[in-house]
């Protein structure tokens, strides 16, 4: 047998015994595959996409986290942390919580854009000159472009422009800044001092499924428990019809839970919303994290009757 044929046979044998993401080709390619996620505050990385990142980590794909603010205006939602010393040092404590969550989830790097939390819409803090809401689009966008050009992600996840269910100024700004950076990072003519151009191949929005909320609500009712989901939340139009991508994160529910609990100032361990159902039941009820593919420079596999199951589809060898 020639070297070429024996080598091809070896690759075929290896590929047939390796799980998804782990063909010989993908073992090599995964080292250079990168996901970049952009979030507004510490704890957002845990409530949106943590299980996906943990799963990618276990398959050798690196993930980069960009957190835009320090969460200084966050309410203390855990009674055990509602103390004067915590309130006086909230910024430092939230940074420590973020560092813990980053390690639990498995992000390779954390970048802080350095803006101050703007607070909920209508608060005086919205108008502070150092708040994220007041940052110029170009200034904040350039910070993100520099990160994109340095880390060279193929996939980027950010927020939907429709934040009607939670119209926080910083969440709205995350969307605008992300779109700006996505559109300019690959343009060689745009500010070469920020690094060599890099075009992100796929841009997603993280999605909160109304169907998921309804499934959890119905299970609470079935078990005779008080549902944490309001009528307004259940009747919200949501964006389920826009969902293109559903990542099966069975086996990673605990990672998401532990990451949430790392944010002790923000997450009450007794919260029915987060932890009202037993872990195994909650994971079986909706074992997915949902996304909306917004822009793609890769070949997409999703269609009207086929949901994408992989953020990197079209970028990996699927044979």
Predicted regions and their residues:
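Metal-dependent de-N-acetylase/amidase catalytic core
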Residues: 7-10, 17, 21-36, 123-126, ...
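Active-site rim/loop-helix segments in enzyme catalytic domains that contact anionic ligands
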Residues: 21-152, 292-295, 300-303
């Amino acid at each position: 047998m020639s070297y070429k044929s024996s080598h091809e046979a070896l690759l075929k044998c290896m590929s047939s015994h390796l799980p998804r993401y782990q063909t010989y080709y993908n073992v090599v390619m995964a080292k250079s595959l990168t996901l970049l996620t952009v979030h507004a505050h510490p704890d957002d990385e845990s409530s949106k996409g943590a299980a996906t990142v943990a799963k990618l980590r276990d398959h050798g794909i690196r993930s980069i986290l960009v957190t835009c603010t320090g969460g200084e205006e966050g309410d203390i939602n855990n009674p055990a942390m509602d103390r004067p010393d915590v309130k006086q040092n909230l910024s430092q404590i939230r940074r420590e919580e973020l560092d813990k969550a980053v390690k639990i989830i498995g992000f390779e790097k954390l970048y802080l854009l350095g803006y101050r939390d703007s607070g909920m819409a209508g608060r005086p803090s919205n108008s502070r000159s150092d708040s994220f809401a007041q940052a110029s689009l170009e200034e904040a966008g350039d910070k993100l472009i520099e990160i994109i050009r340095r880390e060279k992600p193929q996939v980027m996840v950010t927020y939907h422009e429709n934040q009607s269910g939670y119209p926080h100024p910083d969440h709205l700004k995350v969307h605008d800044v992300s779109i700006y950076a996505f559109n300019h990072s690959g343009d060689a003519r745009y500010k070469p001092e920020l690094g060599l151009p890099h075009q992100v191949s796929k841009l997603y929005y993280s999605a909160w499924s109304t169907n998921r909320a309804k499934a959890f609500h119905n299970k609470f009712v079935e078990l005779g428990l008080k549902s944490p989901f309001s009528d307004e939340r259940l009747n919200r139009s949501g964006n389920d019809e826009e969902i293109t991508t559903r990542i099966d994160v069975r086996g990673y529910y605990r990672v998401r839970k532990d990451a949430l609990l790392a944010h002790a100032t923000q997450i009450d361990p007794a919260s029915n919303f987060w932890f009202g159902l037993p872990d195994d039941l909650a994971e079986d009820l909706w074992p997915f994290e949902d996304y909306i593919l917004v822009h793609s420079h890769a070949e997409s596999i999703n269609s009207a009757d086929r949901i994408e199951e992989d953020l990197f589809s079209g970028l990996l060898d699927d044979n």
